[in-house]
């Protein structure tokens, strides 16, 4: 662990469901969950306040059901929101096994399972040293968990929004399909929007641009990558105003 002071005192980490699946097609990879909880515990040890938004694509993918007309878009999105709750429960317990006090806050009221999301309460918990996991997206259909991550990051006044992926940044084309793909070290929000690079959906990018909150895309499987980003070291791709 570095002796340096972290560059960011409060961050919002976006974990996609696909990232939590690791090498599996579906479900939660326990090794990934364990590594991420350890990385977050390291950040807490440095005094960094951590909010997390989790996706649900590892547990539910509604495109096929919607394509075949079996469920409508609104229902499909609601099913996806519930999938994020399951991922959030798993992450909460993984963190609490490391003695990291964690709050699970949902955009949808779910009684005994979570508490309802409130930005004021979330900020208070973060200041008290607790990790906050935000689930159920924005609570509304038609909005992605990327948009939810940017919204929550803005609401909790995070200094940086981090997107954990399976690649080490943003490329001009898919590096898994093109050996000559070029990685960007830095991009402006306008460049991402103009080139349609797929960092996040356009609504999410526009939100961050409007509120001047930088994004960092990094490889969650690379050792110490999350720590390096928070310490201000060169890691992944930075997207800024």
From Swiss-Prot:
Q: What is its EC number?
A: 2.7.4.22
Assembly and binders: Homohexamer.
- UniProt similarity note: Belongs to the UMP kinase family.
Function recorded in the entry: Catalyzes the reversible phosphorylation of UMP to UDP.
Tell me where it resides. Answer: Cytoplasm
Gene3D superfamilies in alphabetical order = Acetylglutamate kinase-like (3.40.1160.10)
Biological process GO terms, please?
'de novo' CTP biosynthetic process; UDP biosynthetic process
Cysteine-cysteine disulfides: none
Q: Which residues hold ATP?
A: 14-17, 57, 61, 165, 171, 174
Q: Name one GO cellular component term.
A: cytosol
Q: Where does UMP bind?
A: 56, 77, 138-145
The record, for HAMAP family, names: PyrH_B
Q: Which Pfam families does the UniProt record give?
A: AA_kinase
Name under which the protein is recorded? Uridylate kinase
Name the UniProt key words of this record, in alphabetical order: ATP-binding, Cytoplasm, Kinase, Nucleotide-binding, Pyrimidine biosynthesis, Transferase
């Amino acid at each position: 662990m570095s002796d340096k002071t972290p560059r960011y005192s409060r961050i919002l980490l976006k974990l996609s469901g696909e990232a939590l699946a690791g090498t599996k097609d579906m479900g939660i990879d326990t090794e990934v969950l364990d590594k991420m909880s350890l990385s977050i515990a390291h950040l807490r040890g440095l005094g960094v306040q951590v909010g997390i938004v989790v996706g649900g694509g590892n547990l539910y993918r509604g495109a096929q059901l919607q394509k075949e007309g079996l469920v409508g878009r609104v229902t499909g999105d609601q099913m996806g929101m519930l999938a994020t709750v399951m991922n959030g429960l798993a992450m909460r317990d993984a963190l609490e096994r490391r003695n990291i006090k964690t709050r699970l806050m949902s955009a949808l009221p779910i009684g005994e399972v979570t508490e309802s999301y409130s930005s004021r309460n979330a900020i208070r918990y973060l200041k008290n040293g607790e990790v906050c996991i935000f689930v159920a997206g924005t609570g509304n259909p038609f909005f992605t968990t990327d948009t939810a991550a940017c919204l929550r990051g803005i609401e909790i006044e995070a200094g940086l929004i981090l997107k954990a992926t399976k690649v080490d940044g943003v490329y001009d084309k898919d590096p898994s399909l093109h050996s000559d793909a070029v990685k960007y070290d830095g991009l402006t929000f306008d460049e991402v929007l103009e080139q349609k690079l797929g960092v996040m959906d356009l609504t999410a990018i526009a939100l961050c641009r409007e509120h001047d909150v930088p994004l960092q895309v990094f490889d969650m499987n690379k050792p110490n990558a999350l720590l390096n980003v928070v310490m201000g070291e060169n890691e992944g791709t930075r997207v800024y105003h």
